[in-house]
Each structure stands twice: as structure tokens, then as C-alpha cells.
């Protein structure tokens, strides 16, 4: 996958999110800072500031497979930017499995993945990241890995950025062991239980309904959220297409 100009700035973005001065104008960044305030110094903490009467966030579930170029594009170029802009009204769930198949062989699950054994391995790696890391840090680490061409090789540098206390060896041990097998089996069950069944990947379910090819994720999230909209949603609502009549 071609390198994005956005990803190298991820560490800087996080620093900005965590270090915006208290006197800065209200914005999604300021909201994130307020949510991070109770965290210990030096530890990333991206927690949604929740009011007593706040409506629930919009749920976005992504069913995908790690080596699918379309999945990688959606994750890095659409889901991640949307998360950056409206993280406070968004609840993202990643389910790495996709179009894989499983079978029970003598009490152990074996998997066949659309893009070969390496995809099965990386599906397990990402499932283990989701299992072992705080949710937001797992999401950011997976975005980092999916952006880069050699995902397995870049597990270590991505962890160093977003979860420096977690060793790559512990993630690989999880992925190659019984826990990785169990996690991928759970993802298989979640994927197989989809109603309607998924037709392709990436398969995106927003508040329980499949997203159509015509939908734009950020606009859809803004439309579905029932509370006070973030500033970016207000901008979207006031925008319109310009046309030139003949």
C-alpha cells in the first residue's frame, strides 16, 4: 500500500491531542484534552468525556481481513480520519477475519484465509492487539501496521509509538498460540452471525445496519448521532455541492 502523508504525523497528532493548552478554543481536540486530564502524566489516555444525559455514540463495526487492499484503504483513509474528527461520538469495533474459513481439526481450529497463511497470521496479530491493548491504542497500532507494506516487520515500531510497554514478542506469542486461535474463532463466529451476511470486505455496519457503497462515513456518523454535533458535523450540514448549469 502506498505511503500516506498522514501516518508519519500520528505521534505528533497524539501529542497535540494530549498537550493542547487549557485556554485553547473549544474543539474536538480540546474535548479530547479534557477527557485525558484524569490520566497519569506521560501515559496516553483517550477517554470520551461523558455527560449524564449524553446519547450513546454511533457504533461502527468493521469486518475486514488484514491483507485486503480495500480493507486497508478504508481503515487508513476513511475510518481513521473520521475517528480523528469525531472520536467523541464514535465507538469503533474491529473484527479481523473477513472472508476466511475455519474448520475444527481434532479439537483445534484451523483457518484458511483469502490472501494466504500470512493473512491468517496477521489477523491473529491484530486480534491479539485488540485483546491486550487499551481500545484506542489498539486501534491506532492497527492503523499504523495496516498503513505499512511489511506489517509483521513494522509491528515493533508501531508498538513503540502507541504501546511502548507491550513487547512484540508477547503479541506474537499470543498470535501463534492457543489464545490467537481462540480470538480468531470468536471473530469467525461474529462474522458468520452477521444479518444480512457480509457480501464482501470491508463490510461496515453502522448502528446495526450495513453501510452502502454510496454512504460517506463521516457524514453518516454525523447524521445518526442524536446529541449535540461536533463542529465538523455543523460544517458538513451547512456544506452543499456546487453545480454549473448549462
Swiss-Prot record:
Disulfide bridge partners, by residue number: 68-71
PTMs per UniProt: N-glycosylated. Sugar chains contain mannose-6-phosphate. Synthesized as a 35 kDa precursor which is then processed into the mature 30 kDa form via cleavage of N-terminal and C-terminal propeptides. Processing of the precursor is mediated by multiple lysosomal proteases.
One Pfam entry name: GILT
Source superkingdom: Eukaryota
Keyword terms, alphabetized: Disulfide bond, Glycoprotein, Immunity, Lysosome, Oxidoreductase, Redox-active center, Secreted, Signal
One of the GO biological process terms: antigen processing and presentation of exogenous peptide antigen via MHC class II
Propeptide: 27-53, 229-246
Induction comment from the UniProt entry of this chain: By LPS in spleen and blood.
Localization in the cell: Secreted; Lysosome
Task performed by this protein: Lysosomal thiol reductase that can reduce protein disulfide bonds. May facilitate the complete unfolding of proteins destined for lysosomal degradation. Plays an important role in antigen processing. Facilitates the generation of MHC class II-restricted epitodes from disulfide bond-containing antigen by the endocytic reduction of disulfide bonds. Also facilitates MHC class I-restricted recognition of exogenous antigens containing disulfide bonds by CD8+ T-cells or crosspresentation.
Assembly: Dimer; disulfide-linked.
Entry protein name: Gamma-interferon-inducible-lysosomal thiol reductase
Amino acid at each position: 500500500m502506498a505511503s500516506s502523508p498522514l501516518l508519519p504525523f500520528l505521534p505528533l497528532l497524539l501529542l497535540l491531542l494530549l498537550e493542547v493548552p487549557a485556554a485553547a478554543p473549544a474543539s474536538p481536540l480540546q474535548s479530547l484534552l479534557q477527557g485525558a486530564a484524569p490520566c497519569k502524566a506521560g501515559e496516553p489516555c483517550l477517554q470520551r468525556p461523558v455527560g449524564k444525559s449524553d446519547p450513546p455514540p454511533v457504533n461502527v463495526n468493521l469486518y475486514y481481513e488484514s491483507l485486503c487492499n480495500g480493507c486497508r484503504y478504508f481503515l487508513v483513509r476513511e475510518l481513521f480520519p473520521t475517528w480523528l474528527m469525531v472520536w467523541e461520538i464514535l465507538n469503533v469495533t474491529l473484527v479481523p477475519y473477513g472472508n476466511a474459513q475455519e474448520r475444527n481439526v481434532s479439537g483445534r481450529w484451523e483457518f484458511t484465509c483469502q490472501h494466504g497463511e500470512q493473512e491468517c497470521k496477521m489477523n491473529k496479530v491484530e486480534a491479539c492487539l485488540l485483546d491486550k491493548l487499551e481500545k484506542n491504542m489498539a486501534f491506532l497500532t492497527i492503523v499504523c501496521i495496516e498503513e505499512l507494506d511489511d506489517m509483521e516487520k513494522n509491528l515493533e515500531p508501531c508498538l513503540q509509538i502507541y504501546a511502548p510497554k507491550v513487547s512484540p514478542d508477547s503479541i506474537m506469542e499470543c498470535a501463534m498460540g492457543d489464545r490467537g486461535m481462540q480470538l480468531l474463532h470468536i471473530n469467525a463466529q461474529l462474522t458468520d452471525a452477521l444479518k444480512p451476511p457480509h457480501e464482501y470486505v470491508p463490510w461496515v455496519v453502522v448502528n446495526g445496519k450495513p453501510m452502502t457503497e454510496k454512504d460517506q462515513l463521516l457524514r453518516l456518523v454525523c447524521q445518526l448521532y442524536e446529541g449535540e454535533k461536533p463542529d465538523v458535523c455543523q460544517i458538513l450540514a451547512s456544506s452543499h455541492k456546487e453545480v454549473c448549469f448549462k
